[in-house]
Amino acid sequence: MIHNQEVNGDLQSRGIRFIMDTDGRQLIPWEEIQSDDVVIIPAFGTTIEIENLLLDKGVEVQKYNTTCPFVEKVWNRAHKLGGDKYTVVIHGKPRHEETRATFSHSARSAPAIIVRDMEDAIRVGEFILGNASRGTFLEQFKEKLSPGFDPDKDLERVGVVNQTTMLATETQAIADYFKDVMLRKYGAGNIKAHFADTRDTLCYATNDNQDATYQLLETDADLAVVVGGYNSSNTSHIVELCERKFPTYFINSDSEIKSSEEIHHFDYPNKRKLVTRDFLPEKTPVRIVLTSGASCPDTLVDRVMLRLLDFFPAARPVESLMQEW
C-alpha cells in the first residue's frame, strides 16, 4: 500500500494480499482476480493498463482507490500539458510504482519521457541543443519513452513533473535546467512557447518534510535517526540529507534499537543491513535528530522516541514536555 514494512505487515496480518511487489513482479496471477474481489489501488496509484484490466473483469476500481491526491494532481497537470501540446518530462525512478503510473497517465495525452536525475536531464538537453545524435538518445532512453516518441519534434515544448517523493530541490533544479536549455535554443522572447512552469505540482507534504530536514541540519546534533520503510523513496532522500552532516541511522521500527549500545540499521546505497555498536556518544547532553519519511506512521516515530528516551533516566517525562506545547 505504501513503502513501509510495518504498515504493509499489519495489512497482511489482517488478510490483505499483494498482487505485485514493489518492482512490479506478479505475486498473484491476474487470472485469479474475480469480479467480487476487493482490489485496493495503493497510494502511488496504478497504470491505466491495470485499471482497464480490472474494469474488464468487472472489478470496482474507484470505491477502494487510495491514490494520493498529490499524485493525481501531477496526472491532471500532465493531461493539461498534453492538451497544450507540451511533452511531459517526468523526474522519477523508472521502476517506482508511482513513476510507472504517472508515465502511463501522461502518455495517454502527451509524449512522455522519464529522467532519473540531472545526468539524464543533461543528456536530453544535449540532444535538444544539437550536441547528441538521435541514435544515441534513443538508445539511452529506450525504456523511458512513450510509444512513438520522436525526439526531433517532441522535445520542442516541455514541462517537468515529478514522482512526488523525489527531492523537490532536485526536481526544481532539473526544471530550471530545461528552462535554461530552451532559453539558449529559442531565446527569452519565446520561452513560454517552449517551457511550461509546473512548480506548483510539487507535493507539499514531501516538500515540508524535506524543508524541515534542512532546518535540522542547522542544529549541532550528535547523530540522526530516520524512521521509515527501507524501500521508501522519500525516506531515502531524508537519510541522504541527514548523512551530509550527522552519523545517520536509518531504521524501520523501534525494534531495531537493540540497546543503548547497539542499533541495527539500513545502508540504503548498498541495500544492506548493518549493526553499529556504541552509536550513542559518551557525553551529556546527547542531541539526537529524530525524523521520518512521509509514509511513516506517527505512532512508529513515537515508539522510537520513547525507546531512545529509555536510555536517559534523567530525561524529563514526555507528558510534561507535551504540556508546554
Please provide the spans of the model-predicted regions.
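The feature marks the mature, well-folded catalytic cores of soluble enzymes
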Residues: 1-325
